[in-house]
């Protein structure tokens, strides 16, 4: 009917350009209102797979006032990031978004939701506490300032871009700590299909020693899944991997380079600081069992 406006909650598998633009505006508004750095890349949202319902939008008289994004590949956990327009809070909008997303995740046999809350977001913290969610861990987001490289080269260590034939080698590295080979395998296989994602494999005397993943986003490049096998840590291999990744990124783009690190991983934080990374903000992750 002419003149009608979208109202209430809308579930989407693929976003239109107008929807993505509205989400971007909402992110900017919420960030400004609380002085935050919302953990959502609109460039990624614009190119969603379209195979699953991961976007939940809430409208008031045609205006987007709430948004929730669900992410999770190959795992029983689903990571949720969302926001509500400052003028429309305390009206149950985010709870409605979360309830609907929870139902969709349960249909996919998810067992747990992980809610991402920036450490300094008073509204987010109040909400997760009201839900009864429990704190799982926290991460610093670190951004590269002035790159301080050493260019140490270790004999026998080779670092190269990986392809799908390296899937088993990468999984063997990433599953060292968790032991969940099947879940990691699904997750890595999915990431190999993503055009913005690129894995690198490090081998020592032709044996898999470590890996990392580059994620090329709209305004920055993230370094993720950075792992060195136990027994080879603290020997300089990780630093060489990180330096080569930074040089590869810098040769291709001038975008900002960032990475995440758990706040209690003091050794990794020390490495990143020594390479020129600086802490930008901190995110807290809260678990909510739904199975």
Predicted feature descriptions by range:
Residues 182-248:
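Glycine/small-residue-rich hydrophobic helix-like segments
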Residues 90-103, 130, 228, 234-251, ...:
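Conserved acetyl-CoA-binding loop-helix of GNAT-fold acetyltransferases
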Residues 1-5, 74, 86-155, 286-288:
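Acyl-donor-binding surface of acyltransferase catalytic domains
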Residues 28-31, 35-99, 103-105, 117, ...:
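Conserved donor-binding loop and adjoining core beta-sheet/short helix segment
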Residues 1-42, 153-181:
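Short amphipathic alpha-helix that is part of the acyltransferase structural core
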Residues 81-90, 226-234, 262:
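A short, internal acetyl-CoA/4′-phosphopantetheine-binding micro-motif in the GNAT/acyltransferase core
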Residues 114-125, 230, 258-269, 285-291:
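Conserved beta-strand-loop-alpha-helix junction that forms the acyl-donor binding cleft
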């Amino acid at each position: 009917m002419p003149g009608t406006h979208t109202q209430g909650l809308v579930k989407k598998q693929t976003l239109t350009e107008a929807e993505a633009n509205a989400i971007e505006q909402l992110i900017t508004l919420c960030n400004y209102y609380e002085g935050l750095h919302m953990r959502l890349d609109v460039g990624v949202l614009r190119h969603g797979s379209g195979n699953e319902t991961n976007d939940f939008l809430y409208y008031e008289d045609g205006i987007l006032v709430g948004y929730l994004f669900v992410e999770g590949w190959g795992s029983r956990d689903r990571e949720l990031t969302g926001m509500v327009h400052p003028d429309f809070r305390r009206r149950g909008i985010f709870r409605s978004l979360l309830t609907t997303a929870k139902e969709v995740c349960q249909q996919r046999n998810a067992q747990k939701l992980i809610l991402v809350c920036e450490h300094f977001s008073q509204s987010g913290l109040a909400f997760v506490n009201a839900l009864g969610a429990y704190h799982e861990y926290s991460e610093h987001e670190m951004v590269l300032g002035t790159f301080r490289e050493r260019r140490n080269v270790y004999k026998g260590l080779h670092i190269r871009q990986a392809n799908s034939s390296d899937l088993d080698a990468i999984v063997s590295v990433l599953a060292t700590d968790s032991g969940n080979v099947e879940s990691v395998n699904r997750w890595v296989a999915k990431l190999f299909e993503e055009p913005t994602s690129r894995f690198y494999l490090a081998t020592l005397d032709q044996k898999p020693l470590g890996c990392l993943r580059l994620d090329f986003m709209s305004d920055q490049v993230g370094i993720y899944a950075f792992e060195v096998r136990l027994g080879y840590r603290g020997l300089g291999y990780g630093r060489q991997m990180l330096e080569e990744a930074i040089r590869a990124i810098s040769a291709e783009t001038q975008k900002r380079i960032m990475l995440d690190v758990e706040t209690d991983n003091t050794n990794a934080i020390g490495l990143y600081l020594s390479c020129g990374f600086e802490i930008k903000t901190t995110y807290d992750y809260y678990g909510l069992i739904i199975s």
